[in-house]
Regions:
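Glycine-enriched, solvent-exposed interface loops adjoining structured elements
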Residues: 1-96, 103-106, 186-195, 226-363
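Extra-cytoplasmic beta-strand recognition segments
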Residues: 98, 132, 141-170, 199-203, ...
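Extracellular glycan-recognition surfaces and repeat-rich motifs
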Residues: 100-132
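Surface-exposed coil/turn segments at beta-strand junctions on protein surfaces, enriched
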Residues: 127, 139, 151-153, 165, ...
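Extended, low-complexity, turn-rich repeat/linker tracts enriched in Gly/Pro/Ser/Thr and Asp/Glu
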Residues: 138, 152, 163-171, 218-221, ...
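Short, surface-exposed beta-strand/strand-loop-strand elements in extracellular ectodomains
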Residues: 169-180
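Extracellular beta-strand ligand-recognition surfaces/modules
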Residues: 172-174, 200-227
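Extracellular carbohydrate recognition and processing domains
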Residues: 179-208
Length: 363
């Protein structure tokens, strides 16, 4: 993300061509308006010059729905990497990473026990954005729980990381009620003081609602992060097939009415209308499809808008916008110098951001 605002970009170019700067873009006139429009034009030129600029990269997670084969691609996509499609079991936990709060977790503590959000201190370290903290106090029990939607008799896997400042035990309860143990109760002894210890368990759901609960009754604190509950099956990569291959080989089966068309998806294809399709058609609504794509750049409109172009390459935008202004004014010398400067910046950007080290793989 860049640091220069739309107004600052415009004024930098106006200064370069010795024109009056603006206090607000809404008051632009004549050459000022030309420069203002040229800034967006220059940003688009940069964005469109390469398919896979790192600063335009995005990740997308799409939950599946049983019986639904096709899903819309992001509205802002310019290129989708169909070799990156992976199928994962859907995480049933809401806010299991505690990036900025502990929303969706209920405090069932008693006595001096309490739960809270921890964003400072050695737990979590600087590389973490946040964690759920349980504090029992001198005479209480800290309890945090969440109700999950499950399928009866399905097997699930729960995993999470936990740490104590001074060591201790944490209890994980799985049941049909808050802090209930109807399914299982598990005691986690944490020995890696100062670091997160990761554990995982499997369980079989006994109904459509399962409660995951963490409790701690020792007079100290415990931090919990990255809580995941999902169906117990291994993620796998989806094979890309062309739309023609889907039409020739798989469409007759997938568009039929026989339930045999429903299964765990193995293939992905691109449709003719900005969607992707899965084959076989998903048999459950508990899968997540994860993939990578590159987005279109954002058009600047208000004075304070910033661009997607990284700060160290913002001079490329200024040079290309100056080029467009010089062409309009028939200033050939300035236009040529600005275009040369822009090309030099683009070479640097490609070397630093796009060029990749050669890699050879045995086949």
């Amino acid at each position: 993300m860049g640091t220069l605002t739309y107004l600052q970009y415009t004024n930098r170019v106006l200064e370069d061509i010795n024109e009056t700067t603006l206090s607000a873009l809404s008051s632009s006139r004549g050459i000022q308006t030309v420069v203002k429009n040229s800034v967006n034009r220059a940003i688009n030129d940069i964005a469109n010059s390469e398919v896979e600029w790192p600063f335009l990269h995005s990740d997308k997670d799409q939950d599946t729905y049983a019986g639904v084969a096709e899903y819309s691609l992001p509205s802002d996509h310019s290129y989708v990497d169909f070799d990156s499609f992976m199928l994962f079991p859907k995480n049933l936990v809401t806010n299991g990473t505690f990036d900025s709060n502990i929303t969706s977790w209920t405090d069932g503590s008693s006595g001096t026990g309490e739960i809270g959000f921890n964003s400072t201190g050695p737990q979590p370290p600087a590389s973490r954005t946040g964690a759920l903290r349980l504090t029992a106090g001198s005479s209480g029990t800290a309890i945090a729980y969440q109700a999950l939607t499950t399928t009866k008799n399905k097997q699930y896997r729960v995993s999470f990381g936990a740490t104590y400042p001074s060591g201790g035990d944490l209890t994980l309860n799985l049941g049909t009620s808050a802090n209930g143990t109807q399914i299982s109760t598990n005691t986690i002894t944490i020995d890696d003081i100062g670091d997160f210890e990761y554990v995982n368990y499997t369980f079989t759901a006994t109904g459509t609602t399962t409660y995951i609960s963490f409790s701690q009754s020792v007079d100290t604190q415990v931090d919990i992060d990255n809580v995941v509950v999902s169906e117990d099956f291994h993620p796998h990569k989806l094979k890309y097939i062309s739309y023609d291959e889907f039409q020739d080989v798989l469409k007759e089966r997938d568009r039929g009415t026989n339930v045999s068309r429903l299964a765990i998806p193995e293939c992905v294809y691109r449709t003719q209308d900005e969607k992707f399709g899965l084959s076989p058609v998903p048999d459950m609504s508990t899968y997540t499809i994860s993939y990578e794509y590159w987005k279109t750049t954002t058009v600047l409109s208000s004075d304070s808008d910033t661009s997607d172009i990284p700060a160290r390459y913002e001079h490329a935008v200024i040079a290309k916008a100056r080029y467009y202004a010089a062409v309009l004014r028939s200033d050939t010398a300035t236009a040529q110098a600005s275009l040369t400067e822009f090309d030099d910046h683009m070479k640097k950007m490609r070397i630093e951001l796009v060029n990749k080290k050669d890699y050879f793989r045995a086949v």
